[in-house]
A protein has these predicted regions:
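Short, charged cytosolic
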Residues: 1-9
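Extended hydrophobic/Leu-rich segments
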Residues: 10, 50-53, 102, 118, ...
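Alpha-helical transmembrane spans
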Residues: 11-94
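Structural detector for short beta-strands of small beta-barrel domains
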Residues: 97-119
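Hydrophobic beta-strand residues in large extracellular and virion-surface proteins
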Residues: 108, 126-129, 157-162
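Short aromatic-glycine-enriched beta-strand elements
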Residues: 114-131
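Short, basic/aromatic beta-hairpin or loop at an interaction surface
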Residues: 129-141
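A membrane-cytosol interface segment of integral membrane proteins
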Residues: 138-193
């Protein structure tokens, strides 16, 4: 079976999340230092009696407001888009690492290259035909495939075995006769033992 994710993916996502947070705090500290400098310059001004001192006072207050406004706007944008997406991707990989995995056997239909966003993570979809015990009919299942990973190179009608977690593809491969024999032996052993 071909694994979609590796341990290095988890480590890369963790490093990316931490680096983005470090970059944010570095940028925020620059804005904070600039704000403190202009505030100290404002406090060191003498009482505003002349036009020149009043204009400096207004300049320092305006610069402080502008710097603070830019810092707030950039914080919302930065923490709302790149950091949030990196955090969601890391959370997905962390859930995959410890979560329950489900093994299925289905008939492959096609890959859908359109982008689907689920939980702030982008996916493509792999469409398979799967038997439903509840409705007693075949149903189309849209299995999520990470956008950053290559799509499975399968043909329409291939019988595949795949493992998912929360409908996200973790590994896949062609169904083989040896797997059937192995699973039958396990089932017979469970019934006898």
């Amino acid at each position: 079976m071909i694994n979609v994710y590796e341990q290095s993916d988890y480590e890369k996502a963790y490093k990316l999340k931490k680096n983005l947070l470090r970059y944010y705090f570095a940028g925020l500290s620059v804005f904070l230092i600039a704000t403190v400098i202009f505030f100290i310059l404002y406090l060191r001004l003498p009482y505003p009696t002349t036009k020149q001192i009043k204009s400096k006072t207004n300049l320092y207050l305006a610069l402080n407001c502008i710097i603070t406004g830019i810092a707030i706007i950039l914080s919302f944008i930065y923490l709302g888009i790149p950091y949030q997406r990196a955090k969601a991707y890391f959370k997905l990989l962390d859930d995959i690492k410890v979560g329950q995995k489900v093994k299925n056997v289905s008939t492959f239909l096609k890959n859908d290259e359109s982008v689907v966003e689920v939980g702030n993570v982008d996916f493509h979809t792999m469409i398979v035909l799967e038997w439903s015990d509840k409705t007693q009919e075949f149903m189309r299942r849209h299995v999520l495939v990470d956008k950053e990973k290559p799509m499975p190179n399968l043909k329409n009608g291939d019988i595949i075995t795949y493992v998912t977690h929360a409908n996200v593809l973790l590994s896949y491969g062609y169904k083989s006769e040896e797997e059937d024999l192995f699973e039958e032996l396990i089932e017979k052993g469970d019934k006898n033992g």
